Amino acid sequence: MDRRSIIKNAGMAGILAAGAAPALVHAQAAIRWRLSSSFPKALDTLYGSAEVFAKAVKNMSGGKFEISTHAAGEIMPAFGNLDAAQQGSIEIAHTAAYYFFGKDPTFALGCIIPFGLNSRQMTAWMYEGNGMKLMREFYAKYNIINFPCGNTGAQMGGWFRKEIKSIKDLKGLKFRIGGFGGKILEPLGVIPQSIPGGDIYPALEKGTVDGAEWVGPYDDMKLGLNKVAPFYYYPGFWEGGTQCDLMINDKAFNSLTPEYKAIVEAAAAQAHIDMQAKYDAKNPGALKQLVGSGAKLREFPKDVMNESFKSAMKIYDELSNTNENWKRIYADYSKFRADQNLWFRFADAKYDSFMQAQKL
């Protein structure tokens, strides 16, 4: 499926949802699928995108196509749902692909890599560049067809029990971080910890970790991270625009009628837009509340940023020499990133920089 078919099918699904083609809807067999998310219900924006998707599918199909949504741990562990979807134990994994970095670092390119594309650029690469095509070719090896289902936008850099004044303060630091971020920070002395979202608070509270990153103000406040670590750092340079995905078992998806396939595509697109809109609306107020309750905002020191960038580029080059999946997709990704960076430098970056300097 290319981007034109997605647009065409989304239009078809809209017609079905509006009731303009009732014969098509009523002719479909009733279907019941299960979706397992990597996120807890408490995170109503992350987990909520699965609910938005499932509700849209139900509405567009006139109630004939129902998808039950399950939070992390209910029917599958947070990081076990990809395997479950691959094997057909469930139809859909709702997740962030970089959680499966250990299987193949290439998974991260379908989600986010440090110093990678921002949310708009990622959506552009997926829908108007080669991103969707390349990632689907890769996921096919895992019996998966992916659909973007939300983006968090740029994230914060996490909560720390002590200040990070220079790169020296990273040595021996036990830091909860997902995906590729841990790999680029490891050479700088960080000890990465992979912990599901619902377990971050107790780990930080007990001192099992010295710091932890999650998403941004709204979700971090939901988890109460400000109560167990005072220093809130920015930017989250390892997650400049993190995409979530629906990873659908290919046999299950291919068994659908064209009308139901169109509905799935349209519902995923709706959920994709919904997630970032909610984050952009909710994060400003949440940040004010966090600062008002005592959170101490800090910017990462320049040496941390510079050395992290060097570490990332070195690792990307090494992977291009050892991993054929990575080499093929990253070549396209990095070219797209360079072109986007050039354009954004003259448009968004200059505009945003000016506006940030104004008193509004």
Regions of interest found by a model, annotated:
Residues 2-19, 24-122, 130-360:
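N-terminal secretory/targeting leader peptides
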